[in-house]
Amino acid sequence: MSGLFGILSPAKRVNGDGLPLFYNIHKSVELQRCHRDTARVSVTLAELLMSVEDEGDDQSRAMDIAVASNFWSSVPSSRVPSSSPFVLSFKDLTYSVKIKKKFKPFPCCGNSPFDGNDMEMNTKVLLNGISGEAREGEMMAVLGASGSGKSTLIDALANRISKESLRGDITLNGEVLESSLHKVISAYVMQDDLLFPMLTVEETLMFSAEFRLPSSLSKKKKKARVQALIDQLGLRNAAKTVIGDEGHRGVSGGERRRVSIGTDIIHDPIILFLDEPTSGLDSTSAYMVVKVLQRIAQSGSIVIMSIHQPSYRILGLLDKLIFLSRGNTVYSGSPTHLPQFFSEFGHPIPENENKPEFALDLIRELEDSPEGTKSLVEFHKQWRAKQTSSQSRRNTNVSLKDAISASISRGKLVSGATNLRSSFQTFANPFWTEMLVIGKRSILNSRRQPELFGIRLGAVLVTGMILATIFWKLDNSPRGIQERLGFFAFAMSTTFYTCAEAIPVFLQERYIFMRETAYNAYRRSSYVLAHTIISIPALIILSAAFAASTFSAVGLAGGSEGFLFFFFTILTAFWAGSSFVTFLSGVVSHVMIGFTVVVAILAYFLLFSGFFISRDRIPLYWIWFHYLSLVKYPYEGVLQNEFEDPTKCFVRGIQMFDNSPLGQVPTAVKISLLKSMSGVLGINVTAETCVTTGIDILKQQGITEISKWNCLWITVAWGFFFRVLFYFTLLIGSKNKRR
């Protein structure tokens, strides 16, 4: 690890409170800041790792302690600027979208009957020549009313807008950022707090560390990073508390927001983007969140965020402001220059007025005026030109490659890059490690919500018991045949319908998945395979419960071998249904839409399965849907399992009349009719003559093409097919980029 971080790791030192010594130094520097009003020293990852004990002999450990002592004694009380600073510059960013506008051929006549059909395209400019600069150690805030372009600018800087649509230049230390490198050295915190509800704060951050920190880093050091981050985020008292949701009490809104930030900065990124991190929070919680962001910036990061309306205290933490109005810059610069700017514009800020609030109110008034904010935009251009000419620009002569290399040597980037194009890893961990972590997290979250699986298991058991009592011990009569067909059709369709619960499960994880994969926390393939594997035990339990509660009670044939095939058919039906519903959950975006689509499609599958109408009677123009029906194959499989014995008789001579108007006549009359039929047909048909065997029933149902084992394997193949489709759906549909 010394090659990666450039420093040695001394033995762990703790104080009387059991906290690492670096935390005390961290606190002492904070106290110095209070007395001397200097910037605070923040602990980078390399400094953190210095406090973690490595295995080695006593001599090596003593040497490490000496190195650590020299290191900490050299840290000044005020923050020392990095010798290789990062500067993110953006120039003339322009982004527009095409929107549909209704075309009215006769606007003077009001609404036209053609309004809904004839459309013309209109261009809306969301960003119009936005320029600026953010430096390491600084916090930049983007302000403006709703629709001003705040989130769009953050998305543009965070590489969340396709390069084909965005015009302008975005550089880091003068060099254009490649998309792959951008994902490694930056992080993006969404406006919504997307977290697993039943994981604790500590577990959430630990799983994030296992995803984002490389496998070469020991478990002990990952835990140390998590503990330091918990202290940095001010979450020590909530570390063992679950995140919570509507049905489970958990952390507060401010704590939840800080956890969201922590999951994205676990790898100590150079650039941190945040979309309105204070929205929905009270003033105290909002201030604490921004205070945490200030510490992150002072540890050597560039922090850029959109914010709706900062308070006076929050304004004092910010280094740069950009005010936007309908995609145009109306102010950019330091918060301290804000009064001077508006004073020179002719609208001085009153002494006791909240400066950002005054600015936003003035911008809204100008937007409602006939001329809009054009005068303010032009004044800002002149003012910026004058400010730029009167100030000496601070340029960095350090190349991006050298700056990143120096950053890695300080431990700032654990999964970073020493080469701008090829030497860095796209993902921090190998495929199998990602699978294990994803599976472990999903199992832990599900285990703390046993009621979800319990309800599903209960539904299967109740359905099985109802079917068992309705179809109790079916006999081998014509009526028993029809009842068997009904039982199998309902049983197979039930297995598919009970899989609909997979829709809300993935939809709840969708945005967590999109956030994590947007910056290469793990591969989409490892996510799909992990969730496929962990779903199998639940399907086995459900299948065993259903088969055990129905097979013997209904009186199905085949003995132990028949039971095993029935069980495996139920299992493959659950598997195919679960895969199909999982695929649909990746396509639809709303729970109710998903349920509607699933119910409709499964109804069509049942309709064309061969139960309501046999294959031979389905019209040719619909026969293709019969072969696409997921219910067809398990349904035909269990029918063959039940009726494949050619020696077993289901209808004897006297039973021929059971399902006809002659079914109620006396037995003697039936025997007389059989004798008459025998004379006409030339075949001796007695009361005990077998008229219909199981093979005859299969022929009547049109089930002669595929063997029962092939039906089983086709059902399994359908499950794999939909899992592959699910993967490609995630691959295509989770790009997280605007067009």
Curated annotation (Swiss-Prot):
One GO term in the molecular function aspect is: ATP binding
Q: Where are the transmembrane segments?
A: 452-472, 487-507, 528-548, 563-583, 593-613, 712-732
Asked whether the UniProt record includes ATP-binding among its keywords, one would answer yes
> One GO biological process from the UniProt record?
organic acid transmembrane transport
- In this chain the ABC transporter domain maps to 88-351
Q: How does it sit in the membrane?
A: Multi-pass membrane protein
Could you tell me where this protein is found in the cell?
A: Membrane
The principal localisation class reads membrane
The cross-references to PROSITE patterns, in alphabetical order and at most eight, read: ABC_TRANSPORTER_1, ABC_TRANSPORTER_2
User: Which family is this protein grouped under?
Assistant: Belongs to the ABC transporter superfamily. ABCG family. Eye pigment precursor importer (TC 3.A.1.204) subfamily.
Q: Which UniProt keywords apply?
A: ATP-binding, Membrane, Nucleotide-binding, Transmembrane, Transmembrane helix, Transport
Q: What is this protein called?
A: ABC transporter G family member 20
Positions with a binding annotation for ATP: G144, A145, S146, G147, S148, G149, K150, S151
**Which source organism?**
Arabidopsis thaliana
Query: Residue limits of the ABC transmembrane type-2 domain?
Result: 433-643
* Domain of life, per lineage: Eukaryota
Among Pfam families, the record links this protein to: ABC2_membrane, ABC_tran
GO CC, sorted alphabetically, is:
membrane
